[in-house]
Amino acid sequence: MAITKKKLVVYTFTLLFIISYVHCQSTSASSPGFDNGEVCKQFKFNPCERGGDRGCTVFCTRKLFTRGECRDEGCWCCPSFDIGESCQGFKFNPCERGGDRGCTVFCKRKLVTRGECRDEGCWCCPGQV
């Protein structure tokens, strides 16, 4: 039984599809130590070793998060939300080029479910899309 080109191509693409699907599945959970249930992100680089909470906050601000906090596991970057409206505006404004879709993509990278363009710029809001 010979392996034809067609079977080899199908097998290769199937294998690549399965590997990319398994590799790209992201999981998020509430990080320890944050009491309002917001989703935070930990990076491999740990600015807490040299800069403490201030270094962590500066690092997180450069990553377009609003705050950072040093925990036992390292530096955690979090979007903090206003209690009244539960949305947060960011300095970077993807609305100028991408509109609402660009803002939503930007917010999802910040682990927030939706984004909307307002006069002030891109606002990331938790909740249903």
UniProtKB/Swiss-Prot annotation:
Protein source organism: Arabidopsis thaliana
Protein name: Defensin-like protein 200
Keyword Isomerase: no
UniProt GO cellular component terms: extracellular region
One annotated GO biological process: killing of cells of another organism
UniProt keyword annotation of Secreted present: yes
Annotated localization: Secreted
Similarity field: Belongs to the DEFL family.
Disulphide-bonded residues: C40-C78, C48-C70, C56-C75, C60-C77, C87-C125, C95-C117, C103-C122, C107-C124
Keywords: Antimicrobial, Disulfide bond, Fungicide, Plant defense, Secreted, Signal
Signal peptide (from-to): 1-24
